[in-house]
């Protein structure tokens, strides 16, 4: 039988790759919905205004890419003085974000300390019950 060994090797390699891909998917961290969002940069503050004016001038345009391209070109053409109001708005939002983030981190630290204490008290209560599964049977296996 030709190719039997190579097919087995390739099937084995494929199985290993699938397992690796499956483990990568499960490792993704869950985002906390209460965490404050990062503030927009000066360019994105500019784009908020630019999108409104662009839609007024071009109401039939549905392409996001075209709006983004036009906004990027316009941003590049602006002088530093014209960019200044957007930069200052971005700085204000950044300062507000930093305050919110500090408050969030304090709240998380306080919550973690409370959770740790509750885990300690819970473990003291449940120490006796850890070996019991509620079935009334002994967990050890007998080979009769």
UniProtKB/Swiss-Prot annotation:
The keyword Magnesium does not apply. Pfam families: HMG_box. Residues 36-105 bind DNA. It comes from the Eukaryota. Expressed at higher levels in dark-grown tissues, such as roots; and at lower levels in light-grown tissues, such as cotyledons and stems. The keyword Transferase does not apply. GO terms for cellular component: chromatin; nucleus. Induction: Regulated by darkness and by a circadian rhythm. One of its GO terms (biological process) is chromatin organization. Its main location: nucleus. This is HMG1/2-like protein. Residues 8-35, 89-99 have a biased composition (Basic and acidic residues). Keywords: DNA-binding, Nucleus. It is found in: Nucleus. GO terms for molecular function: chromatin binding; DNA binding; structural constituent of chromatin. Residues 1-42, 85-144 are annotated as: Disordered. Belongs to the HMGB family. Residues 126-144 have a biased composition (Acidic residues).
């Amino acid at each position: 039988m030709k190719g039997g060994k190579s097919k087995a090797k390739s099937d084995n390699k494929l199985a290993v790759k699938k397992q690796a891909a499956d483990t990568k998917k499960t490792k993704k961290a869950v985002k906390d919905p209460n965490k404050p969002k990062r503030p927009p940069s000066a360019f994105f503050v500019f784009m908020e205004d630019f999108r409104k004016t662009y839609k007024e001038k071009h109401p039939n345009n549905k392409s996001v890419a075209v709006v983004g391209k036009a906004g990027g070109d316009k941003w590049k053409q602006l002088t530093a003085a014209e960019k200044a109001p957007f930069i200052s708005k971005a700085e204000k939002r950044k300062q507000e974000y930093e305050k919110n983030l500090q408050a969030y981190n304090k709240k998380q630290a306080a919550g973690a300390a409370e959770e740790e204490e509750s885990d300690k008290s819970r473990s003291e209560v449940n120490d006796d019950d850890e070996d019991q599964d509620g079935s009334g049977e002994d967990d050890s296996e007998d080979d009769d």
